[in-house]
Amino acid sequence: APGDLLWSDEFDGAAGSAPNP
């Protein structure tokens, strides 16, 4: 989801999202 920094763009597709642990 947009603004979601907890999941990688593989799931939310949001630019700037960090890779999940």
UniProtKB/Swiss-Prot annotation:
Residues 1-21 are annotated as: Disordered. Keywords: Glycosidase, Hydrolase. It is an enzyme of class 3 (hydrolase). It catalyses: Hydrolysis of (1->3)-beta-D-glucosidic linkages in (1->3)-beta-D-glucans. Its EC number is 3.2.1.39. The keyword Calcium does not apply. GO terms for molecular function: glucan endo-1,3-beta-D-glucosidase activity. This is Glucan endo-1,3-beta-glucosidase 2. It comes from Papiliotrema laurentii (Cryptococcus laurentii).
